[in-house]
């Protein structure tokens, strides 16, 4: 894609020709080398940030809690974090605001499933009653999705035992019989296809489409740097639009930042990219996590947004 075209099509902000003459700015950012968190990596590798006069210094984090702690502590300006973690932070009055889209889920390309052993006799939500299920983070989106699927399909989610486990350990634990099921994410899902089977596409219980991750800024930083924040958000919206149309190019970048084998990337279910901060793609996650008391209270998705990001 030609960068000139990128610059002149930024929705909501006039990016060119102002960007070409805008004062350069450095942004301290936190994310993770995982596809649903990869929008900033895409923008960096494509030169979109540079073209917008932004030096975005991305630090990699392995967990949502640690990256949000760094944001709240002032060592980061912006982060990419999952909607559940951002919602929890909002409910705890951490001063942050959502400014740009992140990675999304689409039922047409399920990137997270509830997996069981190849030899398992589990066949329904009711069969899962009383069983042990592993998730990568307790009391978050994955757990809420399994509980909602069980409750809406004849089972009783209150009987399930959830444990926290790193995704790479899930398939071996399923095969060894240490757990009954696990929320298996890409790229592990593709890598372990021969060792497990899918019980259900559990994220469909949340919605057919929704945001998994979003980009947020620290409120003090946003107040001091509104113009920089607008430029950053404009780049990410356009990067999401670019990513939605260029799966081969994003796959190449994904291989570079994650070391996932190209053959696996070609077979993987891929992250969906939605360029606009649509509250309807965020509210289902808030509602599900609040329903299971993972949040202090339910609230409107718009309450997460930076004032200048609200429609």
Residue ranges and their predicted role:
Residues 4-22:
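N-terminal export signals
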Residues 22-153, 164, 180, 186, ...:
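Short, glycine-/small- and polar/acidic-enriched structural segments
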Residues 84-85, 163, 168-253:
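Pocket-lining segment of extracytoplasmic ligand-binding domains
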Residues 105-107, 204-207, 274-281, 301:
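Short, solvent-exposed loop/beta-turn-alpha elements that line the ligand-binding surface or hinge
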Residues 119-126, 156, 220-229:
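Short helix-loop capping/hinge motifs at secondary-structure junctions, enriched
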Residues 223-294:
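Secondary-structure end/capping motifs
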Residues 290-311:
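Conserved C-terminal helix/tail region of periplasmic/extracytoplasmic solute-binding proteins
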């Amino acid at each position: 894609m030609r960068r000139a075209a990128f610059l002149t099509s930024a929705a909501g902000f006039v990016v060119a020709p102002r960007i070409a003459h805008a004062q350069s700015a450095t942004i301290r950012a936190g994310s993770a080398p995982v596809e649903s968190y990869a929008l900033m990596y895409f923008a960096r590798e494509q030169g979109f940030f540079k073209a917008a006069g932004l030096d975005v210094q991305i630090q990699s984090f392995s967990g949502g809690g640690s990256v949000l702690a760094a944001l709240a502590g002032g060592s980061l300006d912006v982060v990419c974090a999952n909607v559940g973690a951002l919602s929890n932070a909002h409910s705890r009055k951490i001063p942050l605001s959502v400014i740009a889209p992140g990675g999304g889920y689409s039922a047409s390309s399920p990137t997270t499933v509830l997996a069981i052993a190849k030899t398992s006799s589990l066949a329904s939500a009711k069969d899962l009653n009383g069983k042990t299920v592993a998730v990568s983070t307790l009391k978050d989106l994955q757990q809420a999705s399994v509980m909602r699927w069980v409750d809406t399909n004849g089972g009783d989610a209150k009987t399930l035992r959830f444990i926290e486990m790193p995704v790479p350990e899930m398939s071996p634990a399923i095969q060894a019989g240490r757990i009954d099921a696990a929320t298996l994410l890409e790229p592990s899902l593709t890598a372990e296809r021969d060792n497990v089977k899918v019980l259900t596409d559990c994220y469909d219980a949340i919605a057919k489409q929704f945001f998994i991750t979003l980009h947020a800024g620290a409120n003090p930083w946003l107040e001091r740097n509104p113009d920089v924040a607008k430029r950053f958000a404009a780049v990410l919206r356009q990067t999401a639009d670019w990513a939605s149309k260029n799966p081969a190019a994003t796959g190449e970048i994904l291989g570079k930042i994650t070391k996932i084998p190209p053959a696996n990337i070609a077979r993987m279910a891929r992250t969906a990219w939605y360029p606009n901060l649509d509250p309807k793609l965020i509210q289902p996650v808030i509602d599900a996590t609040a329903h299971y008391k993972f949040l202090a209270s339910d609230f409107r998705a718009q309450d997460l947004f930076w004032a200048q990001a609200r429609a």
